[in-house]
UniProtKB/Swiss-Prot annotation:
Protein name: Propanediol dehydratase-reactivating factor small subunit
Top-level taxon of the source organism: Bacteria
A Gene Ontology biological process term: propanediol catabolic process
GO MF terms, alphabetically ordered: hydrolase activity; metal ion binding
Compartment(s) where it occurs, according to its Swiss-Prot or TrEMBL record: Bacterial microcompartment
Function: Small subunit of the propanediol dehydratase-reactivating factor (DDR), which reactivates suicidally inhibited adenosylcobalamin-dependent propanediol dehydratase (diol dehydratase, DDH) found in the bacterial microcompartment (BMC) dedicated to 1,2-propanediol (1,2-PD) degradation. Reactivates inactivated DDH in the presence of ATP, Mg(2+) and free adenosylcobalamin (AdoCbl), by mediating the exchange of the tightly bound damaged cofactor AdoCbl for a free intact one.
Chain sites annotated for binding Mg(2+): E31
UniProt record similarity statement: Belongs to the DdrB/PduH family.
Taxonomy of the source species: Bacteria, Pseudomonadati, Pseudomonadota, Gammaproteobacteria, Enterobacterales
Coiled-coil segments on the chain, per record: none
Main localization category: other
Gene: pduH
Amino acid sequence: MESNLTTPAIVIFATAGCTDVWGDVLLGIEEEGIPFVIQESPSTDVIHNAWLAACQSPLLVGIGCSREKLVVHYKNLPTSAPLFTLTYQQDNHARRSIGNNAARLVKGIPFRECHS
């Protein structure tokens, strides 16, 4: 699946009404200065959504999320092997760090430690 976006951005495939849960992740991406685009997805397979989002992203990084789980994927990884997985129970610092790290993957700089 090739990218159909012209603007460089991390693509986020979200199931209905879940982006409000992951605000700290979005803030982490913004802190690193990387744009993102949110698209609704009818599928509930978060890992597959993340991989499809990475395939559509000109930056090769995608996120899939539901209300319970968020996954960061990279286009060059196998579909079943996401880079990061985050559950709703993890704290705000861990959520923000995952957003930072998704953006840092784009930048090619070292990841921040995630403490939950």
